[in-house]
Amino acid sequence: MKVADGIERPNGIQLSRDEKTLFVNNTSGEYLLAFDIQADGSVTNRRNFAKYEGATRNENGVTSGADGLALDSQGRVYVAASTGVQVFTPQGQHLGTIPLSRPPQNLAFAGAGKKTLYVVGRGAAYKVAMIAEGFKDRVK
């Protein structure tokens, strides 16, 4: 059953802590998308949840490089994008970007207290010590 279409280049998916919101990265767009998840599993209320920082426009359109997604225990959303790991509040406001030497592609919280953010991309892996804790009730 298809639940959404018209997403130019979907890449990266995550659920909110309460599993009522579906987040979808759009690599070829300017925005992280959000959908409300209904009781029957369908999704409604597609919206631009957060604007990626540093998205660029070229002859093929817009690209953000947005790929993997993770959440922390406070519901903040972490996006692996061309500029680094972008961090957004649960309301979609950009808090900042964790810079890396190469563009990241995926990420996950792990370790004691889930206070380590592992990030991979472009032939490299990174370990970032965090103050924030990853969401403990989910593997990623």
Regions found by a protein language model. Name each.
Residues 29, 39, 91-93, 132:
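Short coil turn/linker residues within repeat-based beta-strand modules
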Residues 106-140:
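Blade-level signature of beta-propeller repeat domains, shared across WD40, Kelch, NHL, RCC1
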Residues 1-4, 43-51, 96-100, 137-140:
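Beta-propeller fold detector
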Residues 34-43, 129-137:
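Short loop/turn segments immediately following beta-strands, especially the blade-tip
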Residues 27, 37, 82, 122, ...:
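Short loop/turn segments immediately following the C-termini of beta-strands
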Residues 30-32, 85-86, 125-127:
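Structural signal for beta-propeller blades
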Residues 27-30, 42, 79:
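Short, solvent-exposed loop/turn segments at conserved positions within beta-propeller repeat blades
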Residues 1-21, 52-82, 101-115, 122:
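Beta-rich, blade/repeat-based domains predominating
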